[in-house]
């Protein structure tokens, strides 16, 4: 960092969190920050426990992961320390600050009532509050503190998955509802885009002549936003981000229908791209014209992936229950292969052979059929109807997952935390993507993942590798009534299990949700996506639209409802 940049940062932080907080409160914030960091680091290390068979490899990967985290942590500590004037009064106070007093204050105060929402329940469960005297602050002060910390984190010129996990812990510890953080994220994203648009519209010659003068003001702007908010100043708050990192942070603003070739790095010269068709991102906000309006941009990105198709609308339709809190995209990939699979599955479940065979399957249970290859002869005779489309989709999903991973590594989403949701072969694609991120030692990019009806193994090693690259929630959704998935997977390595029909065990912090009561067949996932996300108490879903989805295009099921 140059001396000029250091001078800018020092000037910027003269009017930051130190304005909002008293010296004692600044000590509390610094202490809380360090405890949250230690908590997140411990969560990361849980993915690499002592029971791993290959301890040398596990230790090596753990070192990669924690090295990335520690570098991010150092940046955060530096920024927070500068914002609260750490080198002056706080440095002395931290050593003698009574930790037991923090706990006692937390027990004695009356917390602000949480919003009675499912998302807040998950916030408390997944990111339990850390005792701190800061939760005794007046409500408006806590609101300013949370917003100020969000803006301080953005001074890193990125908003990583770890940054968001940190803010989730902070929100919980300040005893604020999740909606407060989400509203802050939306407001900041819109202001950044608005400011960037205004800048890009100014005269180029004027920009060049003024660049040296305004660059310094811009860098001060966001750094001082917390103090500026207190003082009622509204201009130039997004300045340093706009000046240095708006392109990288909000890189996904041009995601739209971008195809793979223009956004890949290491794979650009490989043959994998040529083997995958129709790889593009489609905005869920404006699916007709794919225009992303200024007000639709967010600090977080969600990519939703369908796993089979009946019509091309199935690329987008299952996902309309995703809310406005994130910038949502559907991945268009291998339309022809997925449509072929969808048609084949529909043909199978309507066939006489399937209707007769499923009774026998049910009587034996899925697991015994898999373990002993006890599939009805009539069903095996028509297996070729499904086996070829299944094999093609399996192969293409694995390749498309590698491409998605490369796109993520090359920041197609910008420097923003990413959520991935997929069912059937969409889940297989995510599996391949996460494995690739793991193999390439890319951590801190993915915030949360939901995989539904996954044609992927349930073995511990595979899920530990995925767990290590997902900073937040990793969810396996399965149904023991998914007989089609069981039948399709019979030629694969069934000794490793099937995640789509059973829970994942012996892996820390992998959530399992059984949906056998509402998913009575593989074709059902598309119809009840919103209901499943609601069962998960997923953040950022549109509850008003979920009831409508339940009546959407009801398809044939593997098994008739009881």
Question: Model-predicted segments: where are they?
Answer:
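Lipolytic serine-hydrolase domain surface
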Residues: 287, 294-297, 302-391, 398-402, ...
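Serine-dependent carboxylesterase/thioesterase catalytic core
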Residues: 211-271, 378, 382-499
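Acidic, Ser/Thr-rich intrinsically disordered and amphipathic helical segments
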Residues: 31, 60, 71, 75, ...
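Residues that form ligand- and interface-recognition hot spots within folded domains
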Residues: 153-157, 163-165, 171-174, 180-185, ...
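Membrane-engaging insertion elements
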Residues: 242-314, 318-319
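Amphipathic alpha-helical protein-interaction segments
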Residues: 1-210, 304-306
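Conserved aromatic-histidine-acidic binding/catalytic patches
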Residues: 137, 155, 291, 392, ...
């Amino acid at each position: 960092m140059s001396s000029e940049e250091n001078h800018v940062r020092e000037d910027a932080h003269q009017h930051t969190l130190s304005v909002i907080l008293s010296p004692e409160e600044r000590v509390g914030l610094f202490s809380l920050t360090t405890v949250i960091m230690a908590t997140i680091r411990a969560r990361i290390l849980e993915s690499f426990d002592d029971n791993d068979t290959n301890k040398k490899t596990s230790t090596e990967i753990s070192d990669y992961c924690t090295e990335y985290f520690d570098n991010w942590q150092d940046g955060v500590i530096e920024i927070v320390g500068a914002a609260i004037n750490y080198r002056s009064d706080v440095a002395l106070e931290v050593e003698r600050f009574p930790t037991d007093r923090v706990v006692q204050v937390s027990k004695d105060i009356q917390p602000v009532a949480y919003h009675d929402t499912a998302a807040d329940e998950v916030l408390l469960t997944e990111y339990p509050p850390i005792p701190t005297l800061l939760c005794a602050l007046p409500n408006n002060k806590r609101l300013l503190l949370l917003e100020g910390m969000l803006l301080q984190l953005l001074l890193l010129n990125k908003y990583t998955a770890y940054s968001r996990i940190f803010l989730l812990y902070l929100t919980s510890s300040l005893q604020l509802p999740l909606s407060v953080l989400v509203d802050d994220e939306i407001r900041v994203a819109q202001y950044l885009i608005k400011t960037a648009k205004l800048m890009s519209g100014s005269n180029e010659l004027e920009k060049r002549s003024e660049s040296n003068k305004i660059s310094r003001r811009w860098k001060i702007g966001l750094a001082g936003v917390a103090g500026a908010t207190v003082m009622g100043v509204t201009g130039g708050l997004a300045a340093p981000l706009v000046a240095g990192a708006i392109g990288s942070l909000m890189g996904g603003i041009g995601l739209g229908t971008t195809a793979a070739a223009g956004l890949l790095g290491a794979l650009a010269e490989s043959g994998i791209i040529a083997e995958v068709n129709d790889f593009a991102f489609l905005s869920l906000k404006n699916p007709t014209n794919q225009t992303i309006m200024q007000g639709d941009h967010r600090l977080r990105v969600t990519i939703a992936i369908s796993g089979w198709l009946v019509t091309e609308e199935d690329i987008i339709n299952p996902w309309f229950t995703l809310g406005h809190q994130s910038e949502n995209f559907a991945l268009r990939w291998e339309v022809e292969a997925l449509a072929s699979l969808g048609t084949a599955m529909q043909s199978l479940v309507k066939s006489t052979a399937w209707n007769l065979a499923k009774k026998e399957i049910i009587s034996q249970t899925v697991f015994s059929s898999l373990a002993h290859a006890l599939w009805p002869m009539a069903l095996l005779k028509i297996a070729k109807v499904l086996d070829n489309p299944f094999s093609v989709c399996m192969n293409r999903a694995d390749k498309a997952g590698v491409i998605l991973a490369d796109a993520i590594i090359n920041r197609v989403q910008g420097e923003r935390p990413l959520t991935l949701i997929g069912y059937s072969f969409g889940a297989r694609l995510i599996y391949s993507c996460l494995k690739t991120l793991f193999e390439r030692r890319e951590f801190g990019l993915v915030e949360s993942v939901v995989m539904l009806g996954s044609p992927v193994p349930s073995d511990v090693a595979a899920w530990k590798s995925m767990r290590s690259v997902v900073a937040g929630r990793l969810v396996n959704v399965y149904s023991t009534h998914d007989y089609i998935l069981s039948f399709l997977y019979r030629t694969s390595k069934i000794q490793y299990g099937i995640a789509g029909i059973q829970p994942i065990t012996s892996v820390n912090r992998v959530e399992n949700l059984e949906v056998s009561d509402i998913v009575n067949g593989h074709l059902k996932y598309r119809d009840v996506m919103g209901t499943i996300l609601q069962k998960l108490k997923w953040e950022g879903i549109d509850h008003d639209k979920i009831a409508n989805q339940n009546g959407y295009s009801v398809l044939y099921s593997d098994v008739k409802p009881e």
